[in-house]
C-alpha cells in the first residue's frame, strides 16, 4: 500500500498536460491506482484472516478457522453500519476492522480493547495480576511499544490500580479507546472502498437464449 501511495504522490507532483488525451490518461491512471489499492487491501485482509486469532481462545484447526471467517453476505455486511457493536460482534467484521486500522497505523486501539475484553473474563487472581502488568507495559506506560492515546490522569490511575489488580483496572481507558474508534475509525471504515465492495449485491447476468 505504501508503494501505491508513493506512486500517487509522484503522479500528483508531475506537471499538468493541457491536452485532452493527457487528461484521459490521467483518469485511467487514477482508476488503475484505486484498483491496485483495493486489491492490496483485500490481500492484507486475507492474510490477516488466515493468521489472526482471538485473545484468550485456543487456536483450532484450519477447517474451523476457515468456517469462522466465512465472507459475509451483502446483507450481513450492511448490518455493520447500524452499530459499532454489530461490527465487533462479527468475527469477519472484527478482522476486517483490524486490518483497516493496521492500514491506518492505529491497530493498537483495537488490540488494547480486545486485551481488555480478555482481561475482564480472567478469574484467577494470579493471571489477573500478570495480564494487568502485560497490558500496562504493552499499551499504557510511557513509550510502550503499542502506546494508546489516553490522558495522563488515566495512566496514573491505572498504574495505581494494577498494584492490586481487579477486573475493572482498565475500564475507563477501554471506554475512551472504544469511543475514539467509534467516532473516528469506524465511520472511515464504513466509507472505505473495501466495505462498500462487501455491501454490493452481485449482478445477475442472463445469457441470451439460443435461437
UniProtKB/Swiss-Prot annotation:
Domain of life per record: Eukaryota
SUPFAM superfamilies: Regulator of G-protein signaling, RGS
Protein name per UniProt: Regulator of G-protein signaling 2
Record key words, sorted: Cell cycle, Cell membrane, Cytoplasm, GTPase activation, Membrane, Mitochondrion, Nucleus, Phosphoprotein, Signal transduction inhibitor, Translation regulation
Molecular function via GO: adenylate cyclase inhibitor activity; beta-tubulin binding; calmodulin binding; G-protein alpha-subunit binding; GTPase activator activity; GTPase activity
Tissue expression: Expressed in acute myelogenous leukemia (AML) and in acute lymphoblastic leukemia (ALL).
Matches recorded under SMART domains: RGS
PTMs per UniProt: Phosphorylated by protein kinase C. Phosphorylation by PRKG1 leads to activation of RGS2 activity.
Region named Disordered: 14-33, 49-68
Entry keyword Metal-binding: no
Organism: Homo sapiens
Oligomeric and partner information: Interacts with GNAQ. Does not interact with GNAI1 and GNAI3. Interacts with EIF2B5. Interacts with PRKG1 (isoform alpha).
Mutagenesis / variant outcome for changing residue 44 to H: Found in hypertensive patients; uncertain significance; decreased down-regulation of angiotensin-activated signaling pathway; reduced localization at the cell membrane
Phenotype upon changing residue 3 to G: No effect on down-regulation of angiotensin-activated signaling pathway
Effect of residue 18 to N: No effect on down-regulation of angiotensin-activated signaling pathway
Outcome following mutation: residue 50 to K: No effect on down-regulation of angiotensin-activated signaling pathway
Effect upon mutating residue 2 to R: Found in hypertensive patients; likely benign; no effect on down-regulation of angiotensin-activated signaling pathway
Gene Ontology terms: biological process: brown fat cell differentiation; G protein-coupled receptor signaling pathway; maternal process involved in female pregnancy; negative regulation of cardiac muscle hypertrophy; negative regulation of cell growth involved in cardiac muscle cell development; negative regulation of G protein-coupled receptor signaling pathway; negative regulation of glycine import across plasma membrane; negative regulation of JNK cascade
Documented effect of changing residue 110 to A: Near loss of EIF2B5 binding and inhibition of in vitro translation
Effect of residue 105 to A: Near loss of EIF2B5 binding and inhibition of in vitro translation
Annotated phenotype, changing residue 196 to R: No effect on down-regulation of angiotensin-activated signaling pathway
Domain RGS stretches: 83-199
